[in-house]
């Protein structure tokens, strides 16, 4: 496998992609190319080569992939329909892909037999990558800590956060930890063929997460349980999420409520040498998002 010098980051202005880009730039040893829909507002470091485009444009993606040694690939779609075109466009130009997959994917299970919609489409993309790229690494993160920003609107106007499945246990993961693992997989040897299950360091219910936000902000926040239908209406109307996102989300939550309690992995520390950050750390760093 050739030495990695030039790296393409897709989703470079997102929670994880921006961190990946920043770490690669800080290392000072790589040429970083970023793919974004709007270069004018990307706000990336001047040394980054910014290309206009997205994963829905296979031709543009192929052009952005020319001359790169590795690609950080995220998947913004709610299906795997375009996976063949996307992976083919990348695979013609690079030998190494680090894919931001999902913790919903289950090992040894075919895409169509995965237990959640998210697991099905992410495993389908994984399969395309495995068939097309010689050096691949899948990152399967647990829930993103950043996703709890969707409570910010409720937190700003009161001390009650309303939603469904407040007892749902999750392993919230800091985006900086995902990025740190991604950078090592992009730039180091020894990660080919790995599917890393990445988790935060503690199991927290949604109600506990709300309480932690309140403790960091110095406010008595509490969770109020809604029915699934009421939560769906809130997510669609008040929070503005599309139905294609809300239904798989709630389906996944319902299945997770009856699944075995999630297990903390030590993968972040094993790969990076540093323990995974806590949710309280994430909230402290992003407290301004809730005020």
What do the PLM-derived regions correspond to, one by one?
Residues 229-291:
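A hydrophobic C-terminal alpha-helical subdomain
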Residues 60-64, 279-282:
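Hydrophobic alpha-helical packing elements
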Residues 226:
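Acidic/histidine-enriched alpha-helical segments
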Residues 2-45, 56-59, 66-68, 77-84, ...:
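Oxidoreductase cofactor-interface core, primarily capturing Rossmann-like NAD(P)-dependent enzymes
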Residues 53:
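Cofactor-binding loops of NAD(P)H-dependent oxidoreductases
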